[in-house]
Each structure stands twice: as structure tokens, then as C-alpha cells.
């Protein structure tokens, strides 16, 4: 009898390990692509001869498609239950569309190429967040440990691409990005297939009823302002550092340090959930984000200050994203989970990120990169007010740990 009871236990353990690595794999490659694009794409565009406003507009397309694509694909995922197939479609078409970059089109042609490949690429993550949380089942506290492999992928690519670009022209960047797209495609086909089509899933209340909740409005507004504040960082941080005399390898290492801090945060996040409320952690993270933008604006010529400001990425992205994913899981339920993740991606990373990129472009064009980061600090100050006044946890859930069970 002992032998018979042991076998299922080992089988479940092995199955859990396999699922963990399959889930982690796509995060690695998805964020590896971000590691190739965010730090260096603006430098590539600058090398192509585009102006600061043109660079801001092109970088904003990465965010613009997040407004539409996640909502459309999230709705399809909730409607059909075929999230894995949709992820695979987005990976394949996104990779094929990226090939248009090699034609070296002018401004509007490149914008069209970027709109197409980011439309399909940006559809992947919100769908995959749902796949991951469902794949983890009742053990959702392991989300941070799965998601941290995305940070590992980001760091690996940032460091590798930065080292290569110190030896070759930045014009070669698309050739360095292409293998990462291939990694996304391969990892998408390693995800276990959908277990049948689910036409309609149970959920608590209507989507409209959830969206009119004051706390939910505050949640989206808080994240919208947070992503506006990141516009200068994602668009001009590398150019800002280059203006202060940092090499491409050093720029890559500074980006990597921020994500390394994010990994550390993901590892300990479950402990923070157990001790503090969502509102407490959000207020602390936003305050540290405000400090980060001020330090970058005023003290980028001091390396130790930059090192410290990059460690604060654990707060400005890591803590806020982990909290937001769990918040949506607690508020939107199973029936609206995909649409909740899509709205989070579209309204915050999409609309907020695009507006932040454009606004920072005008500030950099007229006044320089330092003032753009002061604009980021102002946006965070408003986010702090919103969070302090109106943000509350989902009903009956005093902490994120409870909402994750």
C-alpha cells in the first residue's frame, strides 16, 4: 500500500516542476525582448537620424498597441477559452511582422511595422498572466518565482546586447533582436494545450459593475499615472545616460541592476503580502518611485546615486506590478479575469506609457532629459494622492495574500 500511495505523490511533484518551467520559459523570452528593445531601441532610432519627437512617437507605438490589443485578445480569451492558441498566434505573427524592420523604412513605414509587430506581441502577456495564475492553481504565491524568470531574461539580454553594441554599430540591433523573437515562438509552443474550449466562465458580477467601483477606478488611475511617469525612463533613459558620458555596456549594466532588484523583490513579495496591506505597500512603492525620478533628474553624474536609483526599480515596477496582478485576480474573478488583465495592460502600460513617452519627447526636445524626469516625479505625486484618498482592497480581503487563495 505504501508503494501505491507514493507513486501519485512523486507524479504530482514531477508534473508541478514541469509546469513551473514551462510557465517560466515564455516569461524569460518575452522580457528578453524587452531587454533588447527598451534600453537600446531609442539609440538605434537616434542612429537612424530620427529627431527626439520622432523617437518618442516611435517608442510610443510599443505602448499604443497595448491599449487595443490586450483588450481584444483578452476578450477572445475569456470568450473562447483558447488562450494558449492565441498566445501562439501572437508569437508567430509578431515575429514575422518584425522582419519589416530590415527593410529600413522611413518614419511612417517604420511606425507601421512597429504597430503591427507590437499589436501581436503585446497580446501575449495579459493572456499569459491568466494562463500562469490558472496553471499555478491554489499555489498562486509562487507567481513571483515564475515571473522572476522574465526579469532574468531581461537582464541576460540587456547585458549581452550592451556588450555587443560596444563592439559593433547600433545599426546591427535588429539582427540581435531576431533570435529573441524565435525564442518566444518556440516557448509559446511548449505551453500545454488548452483543455477544451470554454464558452463562458463563472464570475462574480458584471464587468461594468466592477469597473464603476471607486476603488477599481482609483487602481487604474494610480497605475495610469505610474506609467506616465515611466515614459521618460523607457524612452530617454539610455540617451540621458549617454549624454552624461556612460558607455553602452555601462548603460546595459544599469538597466540590468534595476531588473536584478526587481527579481529580489519578487522572491520576498509573498512575505510582504503577509505583513502589509495593498494600500500600505502601494504608498511606499510610489514614494520610492518619486525619489527615484528626482535622483535621476538631479544627480545622474554621480554613479553611486544612479546605482541606488536603479535599485528602486524594485518598487516602481516590481512591487507595483506584482500587487496589480493579484489585485485584478481578487477583483475581477474568473469570468472577467482576462479582460481585467487586458484593461490593466491597455489603460496603464498602453495609454499611460504612450502619453508618458510623448510628453517626455516634448520636454526633451525643448528643455532636455533632466526636466523630463521632473515631469515623471510630478505624475507620481498625483498618483500618491489618488492612492492615499481612494485605493481600497477587494471586498472582504484585507491583504493580497487572502485574495490569492
Residue ranges: model-predicted function:
Residues 102-114, 297-309:
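Helix-loop junctions at membrane interfaces in 12-TM secondary transporters
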Residues 14-63, 216-254, 321:
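Helix-loop boundary and gating motifs at the non-cytosolic
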Residues 163-180, 361-380:
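A membrane-interface helix-boundary motif in multi-pass transporters
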Residues 45-46, 76-77, 148, 163-168, ...:
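Interfacial helix-cap and linker-helix signal at transmembrane-aqueous boundaries
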Residues 85-99, 280-295:
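Structural signature of the two symmetry-related core transmembrane helices
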Residues 2-17, 191-225:
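Juxtamembrane intracellular "pre-TM" segments in multi-pass secondary transporters
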Residues 68-82, 165-166, 265-278, 364-365:
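Helix-to-loop junctions at the C-terminal end of transmembrane segments
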Residues 115-149:
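Cytoplasmic helix-loop-helix junction between adjacent transmembrane helices
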Amino acid at each position: 500500500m505504501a508503494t501505491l500511495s507514493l507513486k501519485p505523490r512523486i507524479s504530482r511533484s514531477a508534473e508541478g516542476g514541469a509546469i513551473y518551467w514551462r510557465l517560466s520559459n515564455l516569461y524569460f523570452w518575452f522580457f528578453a525582448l524587452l531587454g533588447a528593445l527598451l534600453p537600446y531601441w531609442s539609440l538605434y532610432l537616434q542612429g537612424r537620424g530620427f529627431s527626439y519627437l520622432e523617437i518618442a512617437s516611435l517608442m510610443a507605438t510599443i505602448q499604443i498597441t497595448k491599449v487595443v490589443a490586450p483588450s481584444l485578445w483578452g476578450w477572445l480569451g475569456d470568450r473562447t477559452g483558447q488562450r494558449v492558441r492565441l498566445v501562439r498566434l501572437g508569437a508567430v505573427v509578431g515575429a514575422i511582422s518584425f522582419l519589416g524592420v530590415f527593410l529600413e523604412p522611413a518614419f511612417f513605414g517604420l511606425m507601421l511595422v512597429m504597430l503591427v509587430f507590437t499589436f501581436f506581441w503585446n497580446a501575449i502577456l495579459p493572456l499569459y498572466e491568466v494562463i500562469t495564475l490558472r496553471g499555478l492553481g491554489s499555489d498562486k504565491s509562487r507567481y513571483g518565482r515564475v515571473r522572476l524568470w522574465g526579469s532574468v531574461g531581461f537582464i541576460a539580454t540587456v547585458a549581452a546586447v550592451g556588450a555587443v553594441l560596444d563592439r559593433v554599430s547600433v545599426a546591427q540591433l535588429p539582427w540581435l533582436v531576431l533570435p529573441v523573437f524565435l525564442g518566444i515562438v518556440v516557448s509559446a509552443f511548449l505551453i500545454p494545450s488548452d483543455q477544451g474550449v470554454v464558452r463562458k466562465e463563472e464570475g462574480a458580477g458584471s464587468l461594468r459593475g466592477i469597473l464603476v467601483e471607486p476603488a477599481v477606478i482609483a487602481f487604474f488611475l494610480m497605475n495610469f499615472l505610474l506609467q506616465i511617469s515611466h515614459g521618460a525612463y523607457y524612452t530617454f533613459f539610455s540617451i540621458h545616460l549617454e549624454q552624461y558620458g556612460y558607455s553602452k555596456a555601462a548603460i546595459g549594466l544599469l538597466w540590468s541592476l534595476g531588473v536584478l532588484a526587481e527579481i529580489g523583490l519578487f522572491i520576498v513579495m509573498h512575505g510582504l503580502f503577509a505583513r502589509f496591506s495593498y494600500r500600505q505597500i502601494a504608498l511606499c512603492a510610489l514614494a520610492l518611485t518619486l525619489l527615484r525620478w528626482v535622483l535621476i533628474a538631479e544627480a545622474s553624474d554621480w554613479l553611486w546615486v544612479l546605482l541606488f536609483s536603479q535599485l528602486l526599480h524594485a518598487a516602481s515596477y516590481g512591487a507595483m506590478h506584482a500587487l496589480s496582478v493579484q489585485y485584478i485576480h481578487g477583483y475581477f474573478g474568473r469570468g472577467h479575469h482576462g479582460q481585467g488583465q487586458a484593461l490593466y495592460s491597455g489603460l496603464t502600460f498602453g495609454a499611460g506609457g504612450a502619453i508618458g513617452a510623448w510628453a517626455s519627447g516634448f520636454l526633451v526636445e525643448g528643455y532636455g532629459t533632466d526636466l523630463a524626469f521632473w515631469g515623471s516625479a510630478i505624475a507620481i505625486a498625483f498618483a500618491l494622492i489618488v492612492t492615499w484618498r481612494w485605493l481600497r482592497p477587494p471586498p472582504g480581503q484585507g491583504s493580497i495574500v487572502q485574495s490569492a487563495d
